[in-house]
């Protein structure tokens, strides 16, 4: 009789223990019930000291991710173009004064004993090490905080194969390019810590083609990815001015533009921004868009721009939120609308 009376109590106690056990397990990032995706855009301010060592960059990134989670509890955190690109310089950043030009920086490194013929060769030879570092930083943070992270872009190196007769190459630059390719690549990390998506910039700038000898990606490799029930698609800076993605991205739920505007943010630049993602949103009818900007400077390079969130409206997408500044770091947050701004069949 005593045993029979103790069974309900035992079952209740077991239920409590099971509940406590499962409360310590990682919870699903998004439910299956159509939870609106929460996104924080990091208007990242470049500082030379961030790239002085892997530990310094990791600490800076960790602080920003923690701040985003503390203030907004996002599912997805997005960093802009070039955020990870200068991680290739962690061994030499302290030797480079912020006021010198890129060309002067190369000479300083040569004088200090660094073997560097040109920027393409330097970033290509650092490519494997940089990719591993990026995966460790962003993959580690995504797993640590159980979020999705777009770690900006970096210069991705791919081997082309052995050059049989490098003497036939016309100069050092051509020889370097014949050995391997560099791409401006974005990478997305999931809460498991793995890289789950990547995409290369297609329409390169003069800086990227002439100084870095980057090669373009392909629009057909820009499919985006699902996060929960939300299809997220991307373009990288200058790509957003071109209509290649209007049909390709149609049907997505949110379009994210990773931008590094290397010019003063003045009236003309504002008009340029208006010809980028707002036009793509209007043409593709993607219901929501995000532009996330790099700001700050490194060597004689500088970047300015205002990050913003857009919502589709016939004829002219509406800016629903934008950063307060164009030259300082900020966090900008939005919760995507749970339902499209118009019937799905109209897209």
Predicted regions and their residues:
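Short hydrophobic alpha-helix segments
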Residues: 80, 197-199, 320-324
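CN hydrolase (nitrilase-like) catalytic-core segments centered on the catalytic cysteine
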Residues: 133-150, 240-332
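N-terminal secretory signal peptides that target proteins for export/translocation
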Residues: 1-10
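Active-site-proximal beta-strand elements of phosphoester/diester hydrolases
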Residues: 36-54, 198-201, 229-239, 256
């Amino acid at each position: 009789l005593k045993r029979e009376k103790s069974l309900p109590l035992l079952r209740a106690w077991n239920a409590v223990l099971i509940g406590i056990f499962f409360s310590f397990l990682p919870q699903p990032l998004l439910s299956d019930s159509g939870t609106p995706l929460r996104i924080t855009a990091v208007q990242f301010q470049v500082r030379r000291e961030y790239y002085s060592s892997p530990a310094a960059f990791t600490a800076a990134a960790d602080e920003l991710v923690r701040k985003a989670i503390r203030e907004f509890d996002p599912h997805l955190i997005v960093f802009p173009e070039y955020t990870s690109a200068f991680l290739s310089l962690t061994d030499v950043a302290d030797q480079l004064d912020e006021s010198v030009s890129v060309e002067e920086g190369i000479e300083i490194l040569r004088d200090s004993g660094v073997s560097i013929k040109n920027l393409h060769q330097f970033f290509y030879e650092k490519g494997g090490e940089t990719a591993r570092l990026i995966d460790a930083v962003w993959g580690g943070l995504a797993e640590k905080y159980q979020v999705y992270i777009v770690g900006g872009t970096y210069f991705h190196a791919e081997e082309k194969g052995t050059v049989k007769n490098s003497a036939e190459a016309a100069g050092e630059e051509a020889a370097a390019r014949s050995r391997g390719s560099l791409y401006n690549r974005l990478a997305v990390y999931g809460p498991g810590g793995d890289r789950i998506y990547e995409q290369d910039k297609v329409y390169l700038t003069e800086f990227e083609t002439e100084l870095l000898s980057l090669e373009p990606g392909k629009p057909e490799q820009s499919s985006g990815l699902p996060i929960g029930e939300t299809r997220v698609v991307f373009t990288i800076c200058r790509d957003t001015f071109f209509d290649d993605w209007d049909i390709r991205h149609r049907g997505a739920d949110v379009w994210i533009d990773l931008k590094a505007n290397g010019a003063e943010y003045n009236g003309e630049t504002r008009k340029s921004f208006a010809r980028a993602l707002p036009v793509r949103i209007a043409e593709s009818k993607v219901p929501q868009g995000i532009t996330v900007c790099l700001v700050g400077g490194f060597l004689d390079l500088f970047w300015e721009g205002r990050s913003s969130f857009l919502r589709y409206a016939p004829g002219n997408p509406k800016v629903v939120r934008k950063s307060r500044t164009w030259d300082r770091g900020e966090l900008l947050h939005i919760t995507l609308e749970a339902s499209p701004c118009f019937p799905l069949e109209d897209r």
